[in-house]
From Swiss-Prot:
Entry annotated with the keyword Disulfide bond: no
Gene3D superfamilies (alphabetical): 6.10.250.3130, S15/NS1, RNA-binding
Alphabetic keyword roster: Ribonucleoprotein, Ribosomal protein, RNA-binding, rRNA-binding
Native source organism of the sequence: Sulfurovum sp. (strain NBC37-1)
Gene Ontology biological-process entries: translation
Lineage of the species this protein comes from: Bacteria, Pseudomonadati, Campylobacterota, Epsilonproteobacteria, Campylobacterales
Molecular functions per Gene Ontology: rRNA binding; structural constituent of ribosome
Keyword RNA-binding: yes
Function: One of the primary rRNA binding proteins, it binds directly to 16S rRNA where it helps nucleate assembly of the platform of the 30S subunit by binding and bridging several RNA helices of the 16S rRNA. Forms an intersubunit bridge (bridge B4) with the 23S rRNA of the 50S subunit in the ribosome.
Gene name of the record: rpsO
Protein name per Swiss-Prot or TrEMBL: Small ribosomal subunit protein uS15
Transmembrane segments: none
InterPro entries, sorted: Ribosomal_uS15 (IPR000589), Ribosomal_uS15_bac-type (IPR005290), uS15_NS1_RNA-bd_sf (IPR009068)
Highest taxon listed in the record's lineage: Bacteria
């Protein structure tokens, strides 16, 4: 797994909407983005790791669905998280 507990807690603290918030859309997108970055680096060195490539595609699709939900519900939060994480769409 790419994220240890300290890194995960740091991301949750940064993007949480409240004190005990661990599951808001922003937090989920931020955690998925970190996992996607890790897998992207992994696949640069391990080009034949096809199972990780499929896992990466699954994570990207999940993040895309969450971003679409956020865009439909709160456009301002969508712009904020998109700019903060450097996501294109």
């Amino acid at each position: 797994m790419a994220l240890d507990q300290a890194k995960k807690a740091e991301i949750i603290a940064k993007y949480a909407r409240g004190e005990n918030d661990t599951g808001s859309t922003e937090v989920q997108v931020a955690l998925l983005t970190e996992r996607i970055k890790y897998l992207t680096d992994h696949l640069k060195t391990n080009k034949k790791d096809h199972s990780s490539r499929l896992g990466l595609l699954k994570l990207v699709g999940q993040r895309r669905r969450l971003m679409r939900y956020l865009k439909n519900t709160d456009l301002e939060r969508w712009h904020t998280i998109k700019d903060a994480l450097g996501i294109r769409n």
